[in-house]
Amino acid sequence: MTEQKITRAISIRQPYVEMILRGIKKVEYRSQVTHIRERVYLYASLKPGNEKYYAELGVEPGSLPTGLILGTVEIVDCTGFPGEYEWHLANPLRLATPIKPERQPQPTFFKPFNV
């Protein structure tokens, strides 16, 4: 079996990306359904998430990297109802070296590299 090439990235705020990479956060809540069932890059958006989760991770607000692709995760399922969907995540992998995307990030999925 050949390894599937990753072509998509999902934009998520910190500290939620860090929570996914640590295996703490296994569901991403979105207003849109997704039919994607594959490994995607995790892009840490520039806009921060809720500060209370930084404390739960034991890190200072603003101390986690943003504007970079920090890892990958598999989207394995999507459940819910219109306006409130749960994207089920599995098998997060942290990149040894974060990557700056070549293309401008979008709110949900985007193709980060010119291929």
Regions found by a protein language model. Give the residues of each.
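Structured alpha/beta reader/binder surfaces that contact nucleic acids or chromatin modification marks
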Residues: 2-115
